[in-house]
Amino acid sequence: MEKARRGGDGVPRGPVLHIVVVGFHHKKGCQVEFSYPPLIPGDGHDSHTLPEEWKYLPFLALPDGAHNYQEDTVFFHLPPRNGNGATVFGISCYRQIEAKALKVRQADITRETVQKSVCVLSKLPLYGLLQAKLQLITHAYFEEKDFSQISILKELYEHMNSSLGGASLEGSQVYLGLSPRDLVLHFRHKVLILFKLILLEKKVLFYISPVNKLVGALMTVLSLFPGMIEHGLSDCSQYRPRKSMSEDGGLQESNPCADDFVSASTADVSHTNLGTVRKVIAGNHGEDAAMKTEEPLFQVEDSSKGQEPNDTNQYLKPPSRPSPDSSESDWETLDPSVLEDPNSKEREQLGSDQTNLFPKDSVPSESLPITVQPQANTGQVVLIPGLISGLEEDQYGMPLAIFTKGYLCLPYMALQQHHLLSDVTVRGFVAGATNILFRQQKHLGDAIVEVEEALIQIHDPELRKLLNPTTADLRFADYLVRHVTENRDDVFLDGTGWEGGDEWIRAQFAVYIHALLAATLQLDNEKILSDYGTTFVTAWKNTHDYRVWNSNKHPALAEINPNSVQNSERGKKIGNVMVTTSRNVVQTGKAVGQSVGGAFSSAKTAMSSWLSTFTTSTSQSLTEPPDGKP
């Protein structure tokens, strides 16, 4: 059967690459104990050897602090082997069992409890679906109380590849276990802040324990971006490691060469904090603020005032040299109009303290991109007008090329990967951590998201200003929260609600980003863009994802009204049309809800049925004990 699932070159044909068991050894720590097929061709299934690219696999599959929980689930990403291919998606279920309960206790088991993790390495980002199947298998594997019984794991590999062989990334099964409703109920208006943070390609760290809450929240935020889960993560774990950044930083010497990538920009090095120049402009402003409609959107540290003189040492900065496109500094050519906030008066009506949340300041500006693409046949390098994302895009250019060119998505980051936070080839990241050491390294990131408390800590006042919600933003967020809370009981009862449901929320964010993109293409669009935040849009236009999108044509956007929902009279009409439309297709929404809600049950039922059949056949074959076994 294995031969049927593999091509002549030995490469697996199905979406599942490997089934791996990771255990904790009292002397060696976390290590791979079993892999099928072997992680390295030619090795045995019990080999501990790891490919260099996957050296962190044991620490991801069996996370830090696992001993504090009886069982948990982890989502993680691995880079492709040999630099070829796409991200490998890992789903791991770990459990622990008392050593005295084991039927067969191996000699190296010296502790009172045994921790092991069963994980699937897949080519498809089917997080929830694989989790549902894997939880049952892990439970059955532990129920054997004999970890040498690996036949069930080999059969799991074959079963998953046969059942998922024709799996599509376009259906609702991609979003299983990712609930925007729960996210909105928990973060409320701050969901839009998280959305904008990632649009700006900032360094964002999510923090909470246990791991399943962490990865669930992080991946749910990403599911708000159209097409991101399905097609936007294929390059999210690739980077070219170089030396870590020192305090003095020699960034000019460490910039990636143009030929390091298919497409390269002169300004792709992290642009998270702009050092002393921005601080001089900023001056001193009040920091703590409250909003009438909501608790403070950002957690502001009291010590930030005293940190101003030391900012040059605390924050990572991009190269100070000017771009090759201009002999002047980007700051010298900055349009003074971007220093003004046209929405300040309007926001004062919502809350008198809100406009003082961030000091007025300018926005980073970067050089225009230079695209390098090898020419077919000749192999010569030529300049071409458009940047290539390398992603499978729809007619609107979705998903945006956020997680490309060294901007990483790490749903769970092991402590052993800490160096990535200061690697100069990592433009930014959206990462999750459970170890408090990550949270303490605030100078290495732009924002820390405390999931448990629904807090967003941003220590850079200029970034807080960029993310300061406009009146239109607050209306949009309130529109979401109101519909989710009003329909909470109905959706919970039958799981099929449309308005306020998971698919409905994703539809609202799709309209939001489509309208924002359409607005950037309009002439005389200052008033429209002010609804999203003039300074925010200016900063966003300098990100890699926007430059890639803007360098290509998307005719379908001509049909999009460039007004965000709830931001004006026309915007309100759009919102009303969406509500009417959603009511008209409520039956379709219920069908979608039923398919999503039932997919978990369906997956578990199918796996239980297969597991029952496998267990029965195994029991029959073991009616008589083998020779030599008591």
Curated annotation (Swiss-Prot):
Q: Does the keyword Coiled coil apply?
A: no
User: Which InterPro entries does the UniProt entry name for this protein?
Assistant: ABL9/DENND6_dom, DENND11/AVL9_GEFs, Tripartite_DENN
Instruction: Tell me where in this chain the PTM Omega-N-methylarginine is found.
Output: R570
What is any one of the record's Gene Ontology cellular component terms?
Answer: membrane
Cite the entry's keywords alphabetically. Answer: Endosome, Membrane, Methylation, Phosphoprotein, Transmembrane, Transmembrane helix
Q: What is its main location?
A: other
Q: For the dDENN domain, which residue ranges apply? A: 342-575
Give the bilayer topology. Single-pass membrane protein
What does the entry give for GO biological process?
A: cell migration
| Region Disordered, annotated ranges | 299-372
Q: Where is the composition biased (Polar residues)?
A: 306-315
Compartments, as annotated in UniProt: Recycling endosome; Membrane
Q: What is this protein called?
A: Late secretory pathway protein AVL9 homolog
Provenance organism = Pongo abelii
